[in-house]
Amino acid sequence: MENKDAVLALAALAQESRLATYRLLVEAGPGGLAASRIAEALGMPPSSLSFHLKELSNANLVLSRQQGRFVIYAARFDTMNALLEIGRAHV
């Protein structure tokens, strides 16, 4: 992982709402969750959630897919694994 990509991902997670969103998606697993379920679980207005999901997506921490009427978001475990490898390489 390039340093600039790591900085972007870590910066995205350094915000409480985005970290909570990402943790929820990690717990949900590869199947992910609909945006409406995320907003409900976190008690977050849909417009705020949309902003945070966009930031997480720009940092390659989440991916989205259309499923019927819903947009499903899921954590990108490959990105987090790459971040963890950076830490492991320097221990």
Description of each model-found segment:
Residues K4, A9-P45, Q67-T79:
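N-terminal helix-turn-helix DNA-binding core of bacterial DNA-binding proteins
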Residues L53-K54:
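Short, hydrophobic-biased segments on the C-terminal half of alpha helices
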Residues N60-L63:
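A short, conserved structural fragment
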